[in-house]
């Protein structure tokens, strides 16, 4: 199989995977958080068995593992991990991909709905002039994060086997619910994944290698106000919506994702829901440096205490969950 044939096979594999809706559900506490991830797991299980891998299993959390014995002695064993869920951003779970040879400029993804991807918003497009790019029709995410990673792992296994390439022991793991806080990876049974070192294969730029991650925390703040009719509200009404906005106002706009880069830490106000009685704010905390990360968590706690002092009649509860840590 030459390079062009390999690339075509990879594209076809990717298109077959994105046709399987496997969005994770951030509202669910189950693991996997969506039934659709089971469908993806079964497809990968069948593929690994077809390749002839050993010890192919799907556990109770839809984690798929397999083992390819080495054909070379005395070399390190390596693992490859890829998450099989895609993110739910409120768009359609059904993906309608299209392959477009990009010739520059803005691209119309959906003429009927007047959906465009514009160079002004995505200047990285211009790096791929003259190349085929896989887009959606604009009604969904594509799911390249991480169906592209899954496709590459499966394609690499097929090439190793069909071309009898030399390799050491290889183990693979496909995990659910990365998008909801690395929940699948956290319960991966390492007794089924004994390797000297491993790589996570995930969505990113061509040739990109990430050697560390940030510390990640998730703060949830629940605010209960005091309701009354606005005609008799003076001195009585405590509006949780305004308390939530006051809380957010304690944070610098310069320390948000849209104003930071590289190893800058930040606060991401990811979700807010409110009504006249209650409000909820979710703040994602990110920082590479351990001391700065701890300081950011303290800042959130102190900001909550400050608004509680400002509004003593309100009931404010908060907590910070550790999502993952920087293991550089």
What are these regions (language model features)?
Residues 7-35, 135:
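N-terminal capping segment at the start of a domain
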Residues 11, 15, 42-45, 150-158, ...:
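Predominant activation on well-ordered alpha-helical scaffold segments within soluble catalytic domains
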Residues 29-75, 79-81, 85:
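A non-catalytic alpha/beta surface segment that caps or lines the substrate-entry region
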Residues 75-166:
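Active-site metal-coordination/substrate-binding segment of hydrolases
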Residues 86, 140, 227-228, 285-293:
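A generic structural motif
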Residues 125-214, 254-256, 260-270, 281-284, ...:
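Acidic/histidine-rich catalytic neighborhood of metal-dependent amide-processing enzymes
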Residues 199-233, 237-243:
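Phosphate/diphosphate-binding glycine-rich loops and adjacent basic-rich segments that engage nucleotide
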Residues 240-328:
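Metal-dependent amide/peptide-bond hydrolase catalytic core
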